[in-house]
């Protein structure tokens, strides 16, 4: 049973995603905005977090120090960058705070640090917090088991011009879901670039293509192509609120969990399907 009023802290409160996380936290019943963080020296420090997000005055001011707000939150929501997230992870582990991590672009050492911390605190770590994307991942597993052995598999993703990592975390999660269904390791079968004289396509590989343009929120397609037919499974996001709502929902779901590493499939109970 969930406790009432799970208090959340939002990292990167002044960013595009941070503002929508604030809106989502204020809107979800059973969740309370406890703290909002920005980097040291930000012009937004001292601002009211609700007003910053266009949601009205909340009385929660934007701070730069986790120490200053450590008694004001139960779960920390972080969609920033790997180096910052890992610093926040160490703090949360030390102080017994749950985490929802939507940051992408971690190297293997960063991912291992998250796995290690989950021995002591509860963490939801996902490449994408959209309900639709996580349903898509489940569909990809099913499609791969039926068609993966004989089709050419390609993953195409598109995002806005400001995204700093490629392929996207969601595209990689798609590749991992497909590879796992085929009893493969993605690092052994992924092809991330093609140029010049590449020769014919190598059977059994999973190709990736990346687009960065304009203000595209996020579009992902997995293609299973054979001679004579092609299956495409596509997800398109038109608003970051999709991700923000999923992240705050995950924070609420963490209530009462002391430790463990989870993802959105756990939150949505997709593993039972």
From Swiss-Prot:
CC annotations in GO: cytosol
Protein location: Cytoplasm
Pfam families to which the protein is assigned, alphabetical: DapB_C, DapB_N
Annotated pathway: Amino-acid biosynthesis; L-lysine biosynthesis via DAP pathway; (S)-tetrahydrodipicolinate from L-aspartate: step 4/4
Source taxon at top rank: Bacteria
Similarity field: Belongs to the DapB family.
Name recorded for this polypeptide: 4-hydroxy-tetrahydrodipicolinate reductase
